[in-house]
Amino acid sequence: MSAAVLVADGDRPREGGADREVVDVAVGVLVREGGDFLLTSRPPGKVYEGYWEFPGGKLETGESVEAALRRELQEEIGITIGAVHPWRVELVDYPHALVRLNFCKVFAWEGELHMREGQAFAWQTLPVQVQPVLPGTVPVLAWFAAERGFQAATHTVTN
């Protein structure tokens, strides 16, 4: 996990105050053979609607990151994933929740992508062309840039 907590929209009040619980989330970083990766938009009616992120979802009580990732990707985008490769963990302080994002790389899956929650999807390379990018997604783009020797901006910042 990174040393610091990423604070998203720091000018906005935090729901639940300083002592709120951490919400664990399993996040799938699906990477195709050519190196492009999958981003999905947040569904209508959810916090940060329309922002782009890596797919995934909350862990249920007693569920492992891998089990949650398998379940969420089947439920949300209709695929069955192969091996799960735990990659990085990032703690993000959003106004609505304190979230621990457990990023896992996935290189193999079966099935066709079906966005079951009304979201859009896009296969991307650096710099990503979709916007706006969810704050918790930005560190992943930086990690990809470091791995790939990419030195330009990873995304466009919108206000």
What are these regions (language model features)?
Residues 1-11, 156-159:
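Actinobacteria-biased recognition of intrinsically disordered, low-complexity terminal regions
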Residues 6-37, 58, 89:
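Conserved N-terminal beta-strand and adjoining loop/helix that marks the start
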Residues 32, 80, 89-113, 120:
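Active-site-adjacent beta-strand/loop module that shapes the phosphate/pyrophosphate-binding cleft
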Residues 36-75:
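Conserved Nudix-box catalytic region and its N-terminal flanking loop in Nudix hydrolases
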Residues 76-83:
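Short secondary-structure junctions
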Residues 105, 114-148:
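NUDIX/MutT-family hydrolases
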Residues 149-156:
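Short, charged, intrinsically disordered terminal tails
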